[in-house]
Amino acid sequence: MLIRPANNDDRSAIWRIIGPTIRAGETYALDRDLSEADALAYWMGPDRETFVAEEDGVILGTYYIKANQAGGGRHVCNCGYMTDPAAGGRGIARRMHEHSLEHARARGFRAMQFNFVVSSNRRAVELWQSLGFEVVGQLPGVFLHPTEGYVDALVMFRTL
């Protein structure tokens, strides 16, 4: 699997991945009716670096990395990951995360923080914990899940 920086030619493949995830409204605090243009502007924004995971010429996942805060907090990075639902369970998110750790270290980040991991996204919570993240905060009932109602969001953190 090749993980490489995304470019404008990847936009339709990235939308094919992030669009259904956004529309489902189960894991990201984004408007479910976000337009393709706005979703891509968010995912590929100028404040972040965006990557794609590609296998045999097919993009199966994407992630971004950015500084979590400005100024005195810019040594901590934040990432977002999405994989093609049809490619779930193949370790793509794990591979992208491993790549993001290496990239974060190379960029001089000292830690990685996920600000809003929806607690009902159990696969993600378990994956991040298996990769050394700790839950350092729990925000009660802050995410309105489309089928589970109000659920908690977790703040997850690890040093690099």
What does each of the following model-derived ranges do?
Residues 5-9, 27-86, 97-99, 103, ...:
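Acetyl-CoA-dependent GNAT
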Residues 14, 18, 39:
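Hydrophobic pocket/interface hotspot
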Residues 81-82, 139, 145-160:
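Terminal substrate-recognition subdomain of acyl/acetyltransferases
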Residues 114-124, 142-144:
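Conserved beta-strand-loop-alpha-helix junction that forms the acyl-donor binding cleft
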